[in-house]
Protein backbone atom coordinates (compact mmCIF):
# COMPACT_ATOMS: atom_id res chain seq x y z
CA UNK A 1 0.00 0.00 0.00
CA UNK A 2 2.74 2.44 0.94
CA UNK A 3 4.70 2.43 -2.32
CA UNK A 4 1.79 3.26 -4.69
CA UNK A 5 0.62 5.96 -2.27
CA UNK A 6 4.15 7.38 -2.20
CA UNK A 7 4.27 7.30 -6.02
CA UNK A 8 0.95 9.17 -6.13
CA UNK A 9 2.36 11.85 -3.83
CA UNK A 10 5.44 12.43 -6.00
CA UNK A 11 3.92 12.02 -9.46
CA UNK A 12 0.79 14.14 -9.00
CA UNK A 13 0.85 17.92 -8.89
CA UNK A 14 -2.47 17.94 -7.03
CA UNK A 15 -4.64 18.99 -9.97
CA UNK A 16 -7.33 16.72 -11.34
CA UNK A 17 -5.29 16.19 -14.51
CA UNK A 18 -2.12 15.55 -12.49
CA UNK A 19 -3.87 12.98 -10.31
CA UNK A 20 -5.27 11.26 -13.40
CA UNK A 21 -1.85 11.12 -15.09
CA UNK A 22 -0.23 9.78 -11.92
CA UNK A 23 -2.99 7.19 -11.56
CA UNK A 24 -2.38 5.83 -15.07
CA UNK A 25 1.41 5.93 -14.73
CA UNK A 26 1.32 4.03 -11.44
CA UNK A 27 -1.32 1.61 -12.67
CA UNK A 28 0.62 0.91 -15.86
CA UNK A 29 3.86 0.37 -13.95
CA UNK A 30 2.19 -2.03 -11.51
CA UNK A 31 0.45 -3.89 -14.35
CA UNK A 32 3.77 -4.39 -16.13
CA UNK A 33 5.37 -5.39 -12.82
CA UNK A 34 2.72 -8.08 -12.30
CA UNK A 35 3.13 -9.39 -15.86
CA UNK A 36 6.92 -9.58 -15.38
CA UNK A 37 6.37 -11.26 -11.99
CA UNK A 38 4.25 -13.95 -13.66
CA UNK A 39 6.84 -14.50 -16.38
CA UNK A 40 9.62 -14.93 -13.81
CA UNK A 41 7.45 -17.26 -11.75
CA UNK A 42 6.77 -19.41 -14.82
CA UNK A 43 10.49 -19.47 -15.70
CA UNK A 44 11.66 -20.13 -12.12
CA UNK A 45 11.74 -23.95 -12.33
CA UNK A 46 14.20 -23.75 -15.23
CA UNK A 47 16.20 -21.03 -13.51
CA UNK A 48 16.52 -23.23 -10.43
CA UNK A 49 17.29 -26.42 -12.36
CA UNK A 50 14.45 -28.01 -10.44
CA UNK A 51 13.63 -30.89 -12.77
CA UNK A 52 13.73 -34.14 -10.81
CA UNK A 53 15.47 -32.75 -7.73
CA UNK A 54 14.54 -34.10 -4.30
CA UNK A 55 12.27 -32.10 -1.99
CA UNK A 56 15.18 -31.52 0.42
CA UNK A 57 17.07 -29.57 -2.24
CA UNK A 58 13.97 -27.50 -2.95
CA UNK A 59 13.62 -26.86 0.79
CA UNK A 60 17.17 -25.52 0.84
CA UNK A 61 16.32 -23.27 -2.10
CA UNK A 62 13.22 -22.00 -0.28
CA UNK A 63 15.40 -21.01 2.67
CA UNK A 64 17.90 -19.29 0.37
CA UNK A 65 15.33 -17.36 -1.68
CA UNK A 66 13.33 -16.32 1.39
CA UNK A 67 16.58 -15.03 2.87
CA UNK A 68 17.33 -13.08 -0.31
CA UNK A 69 14.03 -11.23 0.09
CA UNK A 70 14.83 -9.89 3.55
CA UNK A 71 17.46 -7.25 2.72
CA UNK A 72 15.47 -5.59 -0.08
CA UNK A 73 12.88 -3.78 2.09
CA UNK A 74 15.54 -3.05 4.74
CA UNK A 75 17.67 -1.36 2.08
CA UNK A 76 14.66 0.53 0.71
CA UNK A 77 13.73 1.63 4.24
CA UNK A 78 17.30 2.86 4.68
CA UNK A 79 17.01 4.82 1.45
CA UNK A 80 13.70 6.33 2.61
CA UNK A 81 15.24 7.27 5.96
CA UNK A 82 18.29 8.88 4.32
CA UNK A 83 16.15 10.77 1.80
CA UNK A 84 14.14 12.40 4.61
CA UNK A 85 11.20 12.85 2.25
CA UNK A 86 10.14 12.43 -1.37
CA UNK A 87 12.86 12.91 -3.96
CA UNK A 88 13.62 11.80 -7.52
CA UNK A 89 16.51 9.66 -6.25
CA UNK A 90 14.27 7.90 -3.72
CA UNK A 91 11.62 7.32 -6.40
CA UNK A 92 14.19 5.78 -8.77
CA UNK A 93 15.58 3.67 -5.92
CA UNK A 94 12.08 2.41 -5.09
CA UNK A 95 11.45 1.45 -8.71
CA UNK A 96 14.72 -0.49 -8.92
CA UNK A 97 14.02 -2.04 -5.52
CA UNK A 98 10.55 -3.13 -6.61
CA UNK A 99 12.00 -4.76 -9.71
CA UNK A 100 14.60 -6.65 -7.66
CA UNK A 101 12.02 -7.60 -5.03
CA UNK A 102 9.56 -8.79 -7.68
CA UNK A 103 12.17 -11.06 -9.27
CA UNK A 104 13.22 -12.68 -5.99
CA UNK A 105 9.63 -12.91 -4.72
CA UNK A 106 8.45 -14.60 -7.94
CA UNK A 107 11.15 -17.27 -7.67
CA UNK A 108 10.36 -17.70 -3.97
CA UNK A 109 6.65 -18.06 -4.73
CA UNK A 110 7.34 -20.73 -7.33
CA UNK A 111 9.46 -22.71 -4.87
CA UNK A 112 6.75 -22.50 -2.20
CA UNK A 113 4.08 -23.62 -4.67
CA UNK A 114 6.17 -26.70 -5.37
CA UNK A 115 6.85 -27.40 -1.69
CA UNK A 116 3.19 -27.34 -0.71
CA UNK A 117 2.66 -30.20 -3.16
CA UNK A 118 5.82 -32.00 -2.08
CA UNK A 119 4.81 -31.87 1.59
CA UNK A 120 1.12 -32.63 1.01
CA UNK A 121 -0.03 -36.15 1.65
CA UNK A 122 -1.32 -37.78 -1.53
CA UNK A 123 -4.69 -38.66 0.02
CA UNK A 124 -5.39 -35.09 1.12
CA UNK A 125 -3.32 -32.99 -1.27
CA UNK A 126 -6.30 -30.91 -2.41
CA UNK A 127 -7.15 -30.08 1.21
CA UNK A 128 -3.54 -29.14 2.00
CA UNK A 129 -3.29 -26.94 -1.08
CA UNK A 130 -6.62 -25.31 -0.21
CA UNK A 131 -5.40 -24.48 3.30
CA UNK A 132 -2.17 -23.09 1.84
CA UNK A 133 -4.01 -20.73 -0.49
CA UNK A 134 -6.48 -19.72 2.24
CA UNK A 135 -3.54 -18.89 4.53
CA UNK A 136 -1.89 -17.06 1.63
CA UNK A 137 -5.00 -14.93 1.08
CA UNK A 138 -5.28 -14.17 4.80
CA UNK A 139 -1.60 -13.21 4.89
CA UNK A 140 -2.05 -10.86 1.94
CA UNK A 141 -5.06 -9.27 3.62
CA UNK A 142 -3.19 -8.76 6.90
CA UNK A 143 -0.14 -7.44 5.02
CA UNK A 144 -2.24 -4.97 3.04
CA UNK A 145 -4.05 -3.77 6.17
CA UNK A 146 -0.84 -3.49 8.19
CA UNK A 147 0.97 -1.71 5.35
CA UNK A 148 -1.80 0.87 5.12
CA UNK A 149 -1.82 1.42 8.88
CA UNK A 150 1.96 1.73 9.03
CA UNK A 151 1.90 4.20 6.14
CA UNK A 152 -0.69 6.27 8.00
CA UNK A 153 1.42 6.24 11.18
CA UNK A 154 4.89 6.82 9.75
CA UNK A 155 4.80 7.11 5.99
CA UNK A 156 6.80 5.08 3.54
CA UNK A 157 9.58 4.38 6.05
CA UNK A 158 7.26 2.59 8.51
CA UNK A 159 5.58 0.61 5.72
CA UNK A 160 8.96 -0.61 4.45
CA UNK A 161 10.19 -1.47 7.95
CA UNK A 162 6.98 -3.43 8.54
CA UNK A 163 7.56 -5.34 5.31
CA UNK A 164 11.14 -6.08 6.28
CA UNK A 165 10.12 -7.35 9.73
CA UNK A 166 7.42 -9.62 8.26
CA UNK A 167 9.84 -11.01 5.67
CA UNK A 168 12.37 -11.69 8.41
CA UNK A 169 9.69 -13.64 10.29
CA UNK A 170 8.87 -15.54 7.09
CA UNK A 171 12.52 -16.44 6.57
CA UNK A 172 12.89 -17.60 10.19
CA UNK A 173 9.82 -19.81 9.79
CA UNK A 174 11.24 -21.17 6.52
CA UNK A 175 14.33 -22.28 8.46
CA UNK A 176 12.09 -24.73 10.33
CA UNK A 177 10.85 -26.54 7.19
CA UNK A 178 11.44 -30.25 7.64
CA UNK A 179 13.79 -32.19 5.43
CA UNK A 180 11.45 -35.17 5.44
CA UNK A 181 10.64 -36.88 2.17
CA UNK A 182 14.24 -36.53 1.07
CA UNK A 183 13.58 -39.12 -1.59
CA UNK A 184 10.54 -37.35 -3.02
CA UNK A 185 10.93 -36.47 -6.68
CA UNK A 186 7.71 -34.96 -7.90
CA UNK A 187 7.32 -33.99 -11.52
CA UNK A 188 5.62 -30.73 -10.59
CA UNK A 189 8.58 -28.61 -11.64
CA UNK A 190 9.46 -30.68 -14.71
CA UNK A 191 9.04 -27.85 -17.20
Cite the ranges covered by each PLM segment.
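Loop-to-transmembrane helix entry/capping segments in MFS-fold secondary transporters
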Residues: 23, 120-132
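Transmembrane alpha-helices of Major Facilitator/SLC transporters
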Residues: 26-51, 72
Amino acid sequence: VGVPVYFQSVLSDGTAEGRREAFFLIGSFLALWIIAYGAVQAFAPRLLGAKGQPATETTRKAILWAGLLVPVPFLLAGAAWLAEGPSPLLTATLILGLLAFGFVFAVNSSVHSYLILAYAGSEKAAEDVGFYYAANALGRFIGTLLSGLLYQWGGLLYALIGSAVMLTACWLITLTLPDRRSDTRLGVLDT
